């Protein structure tokens, strides 16, 4: 990166990996916030040392709820089905993954932006494009394009748009489809992460009880629990217990080893 580029960077900003999983495997988080040029150099060199390609991304000012997902199926130069939701709660103080998301009405502006973008990059199929409304200039800013299904895709299914099933039938059986409406104001909840993060905030007085509970008492879909198939839910609990006891056992063994020394 040239010195001219460095001078144009506004701090704080984000160090963001080209491939999220490679960064997470090393640093156990999705990205890093840097506040000055020295921090940027340190974080960049850490990534370079671990052969992780990264980009520098501007931080868009605004609350978490200003972040939006635009899910769509794009074929033959146009969006054939769309779905919009906005973020309610996220991990890592708003820089991680969405753990509570709420479906909302379609935003025509995002439809137009997304169609132009997908045309330009020559992408076809399902995508989840993330935007954030910039309160400083009143414009939607592009964050990233995810060319894959993720767990929050369950929200669109619960709302009446089964993207995987529509795409499967289109690709395998050539079944055409047209955009249809969907139910709004349904919540997606990543129940384990939401409870883990926000119980701590509730105990410290950093989270109000009513806003925390509201999604659970409104129409919602969980990331893992389903009354139709409870095995993944109990498997997740079992895996968590195994990890917890393994960590305690490892800590106990290390303490004994230190004492013997």
Regions found by a protein language model. Name each.
Residues 1-55, 76-78:
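Active-site nucleotide/adenylate-binding loops and adjacent lid/helix of ATP-dependent enzymes
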Residues 35-93, 105-115, 132-133, 139-141:
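Phosphate-binding site of ATP-dependent enzymes
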Residues 88-92, 97-99, 146-161:
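Glycine-rich phosphate/pyrophosphate-binding beta-alpha loops
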Residues 104, 108, 157-162:
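Short, conserved loop/turn and helix-capping segments at secondary-structure boundaries
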Residues 119-154:
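Conserved metal-phosphate-binding beta-hairpin within the catalytic cores
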Residues 149-150, 165-172:
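Internal helical hairpin/lid segments
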Residues 169-261:
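Peripheral (often C-terminal) accessory segments that flank ATP-dependent C-N-forming ligase machineries
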